[in-house]
């Protein structure tokens, strides 16, 4: 076995031993954004998701790669069920939700049991004017998805957090979309933009239905981009999600892989750090 395989095996054993206890005692549920392991799922989709389940994740958020199940969502649902994984959500583009494709897209995700469809990024999110226009499109989609038992959401990068708190593009989107729509805060990008992710959960209660736990650093600071080895107040953030976020899913996401670590190894390390935080908090 190579070094990365050995590291995964060690982390899987440690995390797996505690996974049932953590899953039973914690809320929100814990998932992983599959973009974090995009190279590994291209090489072995089923094997990688099986390993994700063994680490103790309760769900996966899709980002457009469905391996051999691209045209067979029912079989993918069976595979997820077999591995006790839920669909925590999916990142989809506006083009996939255009009128001509809406029914096919929503039917695919409903088969997976996926209720949360999130726009991962849009160039209009870089400005107040663009975000105002985009909010109208998000609001229209919210109305179309609600009868299907689904929600639309939007995911931030640093561009949506530019400007003064209260007048950022993120604030504009929050104020101009229905309360049922998801403000999927990416904690890493919020931090990287110099804003407080905890404050934003409290600012828009009930809107953080899912959120990305990603370790990044505020301007002028550095560190290791792994949950628990960084500077983020993960306990305070989790407390806010439980108190006011109406949060269903904490979704671990990795886009940086330090010290030559593999993608799945890094995800496992962040999950280990997250579970260490949760273990010190009151169960809920």
How does the language model describe each region?
Residues 3-4, 24-55, 113, 165-182, ...:
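Histidine-acidic metal/acid-base catalytic patches
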Residues 8-17:
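Bacterial N-terminal signal peptides
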Residues 19-23:
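Sec/Tat signal peptide C-region and signal peptidase I cleavage site
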Residues 36-38, 64-66, 93-96, 123-125, ...:
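Active-site-proximal loop/turn and secondary-structure-junction residues that shape catalytic pockets
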Residues 40-42, 68, 142:
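Extracytoplasmic low-complexity repetitive segments enriched in small/polar residues
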Residues 50, 58-59, 79, 86, ...:
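Active-site acidic/histidine proton-transfer and metal-coordination neighborhood
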Residues 61, 89-91, 118, 153, ...:
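Conserved beta-strand positions in the central sheet of alpha/beta enzyme cores
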Residues 61-78:
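Glycine-rich, proline-tolerant flexible connector loops at the mouths of alpha/beta enzymes
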């Amino acid at each position: 076995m190579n070094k990365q395989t050995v590291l995964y095996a060690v982390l899987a054993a440690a995390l797996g031993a505690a996974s049932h206890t953590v899953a039973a005692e914690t809320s929100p549920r814990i998932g992983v954004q599959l973009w974090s392991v995009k190279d590994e799922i291209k090489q072995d989709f089923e094997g990688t998701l099986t390993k994700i389940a063994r680490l103790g994740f309760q769900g996966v958020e899709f980002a457009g790669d469905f391996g051999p199940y691209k045209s067979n969502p029912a079989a993918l649902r069976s595979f997820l069920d077999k591995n006790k994984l839920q669909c925590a959500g999916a990142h989809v583009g506006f083009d996939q939700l255009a009128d001509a494709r809406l029914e096919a897209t929503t039917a695919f995700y409903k088969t997976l049991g996926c209720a949360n469809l999130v726009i991962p990024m849009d160039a209009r999110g870089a400005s107040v004017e663009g975000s105002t226009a985009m909010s109208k499109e998000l609001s229209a989609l919210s109305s179309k998805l609600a009868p299907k038992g689904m929600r639309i959401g939007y995911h931030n990068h640093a561009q949506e957090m530019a400007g003064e708190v209260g007048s950022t593009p993120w604030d504009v989107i929050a104020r101009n979309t229905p309360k049922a729509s998801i403000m999927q805060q990416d904690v890493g990008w919020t931090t990287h933009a110099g804003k407080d992710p905890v404050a934003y959960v409290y600012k828009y209660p009930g809107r953080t239905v899912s959120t990305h736990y990603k370790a990044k650093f505020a301007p002028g600071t550095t560190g290791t981009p792994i949950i628990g080895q960084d500077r983020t107040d993960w306990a305070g953030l989790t407390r806010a999600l439980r108190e006011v976020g109406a949060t269903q899913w904490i979704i671990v996401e990795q886009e940086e892989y330090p010290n030559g670590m593999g993608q799945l190894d890094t995800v496992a390390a962040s999950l280990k750090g997250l579970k260490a935080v949760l273990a010190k908090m009151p169960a809920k």
